[in-house]
């Protein structure tokens, strides 16, 4: 979901 995308991007930082 959208939240999964956000958390995924933050995890890449």
Swiss-Prot record:
Upper taxonomic lineage: Eukaryota, Metazoa, Chordata, Craniata, Vertebrata
Entry's localization field: Secreted
Keyword tags: Amidation, Amphibian defense peptide, Secreted
Keyword Secreted: yes
Organism the protein comes from: Litoria ewingii
Function according to Swiss-Prot or TrEMBL: Caeridins show neither neuropeptide activity nor antibiotic activity.
UniProt superkingdom: Eukaryota
Residues bearing PTM Leucine amide: 13
GO cellular component: extracellular region
Tissue: Expressed by the skin dorsal glands.
Protein name: Caeridin-7.1
Main location: secreted
Gene Ontology biological-process entries: defense response
């Amino acid at each position: 979901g959208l939240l999964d995308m956000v958390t995924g991007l933050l995890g890449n930082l």
